[in-house]
Amino acid sequence: MKRKCFIAVVLLLVGVGGWLLYYLSDQQVIKRTFTALAVSLSKDGEETPVMIALKMKPVKDFIAPACEVTVPERNYHEMLEPGLITHYLIAYRSRQANLHVALEEILVKIPSKGRGEVSALVHVTANYNQPDFFEETHRVMFSLQKQEKNWLLHKATLPDALVRR
C-alpha cells in the first residue's frame, strides 16, 4: 500500500513538474507576453490619459532601450527608443474610435540562448459601427533578446499597410 501511494505521489510530482517546465518555458512566456500586449493595445471608446498610460506601461517595459523598426515597403529603417514608440502607438490608437488587436498564429523560435524570433498574424479591427470601419490581417516579425530574465523587443518588421492607417 505504501508503495502504491509513493508511486502515485511521484507520478503527480513528475506531472506537475512537467507542466511547470512547459508553462514557464521561454516560448510560452513570450506567447503570453505578446497576447497581453495585444490586449493593452486594444481600445474601447474614449480613454482618460491615466488609462492610456496604464495600458502603455507594459508595452514600454517590453521594448529594449534601442529598438530597430523596419517597414520594408517604405525602405524605412530606424532605431527608436521606447518612449517614442509608445507615442507612435498612442497616436495610432487616438485616430480610432475603437480598436481591437489580436495576435494569431504566434510562432516562437529560440535560435540561441537569449535570442528569440517571433512571427505572428496581427488581426486589427477598428471603428466598428462607424463609416471608416476596417478589418485587416498582416504578418509581423519580431526579434527579442533576453536581458536579466526578461525578454525585450529589439527589432520589429511591420508591413506598410499596418503602419499607414
Regions flagged by a language model, labelled:
Residues 28-31, 44-48:
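Short Lys/Arg-rich amphipathic alpha-helical segments
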Residues 48-50, 115:
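Cystatin/cathelin-like cysteine-protease inhibitor module
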Residues 38, 57-76:
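Short, solvent-exposed secondary-structure junction/capping segments
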Residues 84-130:
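Surface-exposed, charged secondary-structure patches
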Residues 23-38:
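Ser/Thr/Pro/Gly-rich low-complexity linker/stalk segments immediately outside membranes or between
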Residues 5-20:
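Hydrophobic membrane-insertion alpha-helices, especially the h-region
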Residues 37-45:
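N-terminal alpha-helical signal peptides/signal-anchor transmembrane segments
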Residues 115-119, 131-165:
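Short beta-strand edge/turn micro-motifs at domain boundaries
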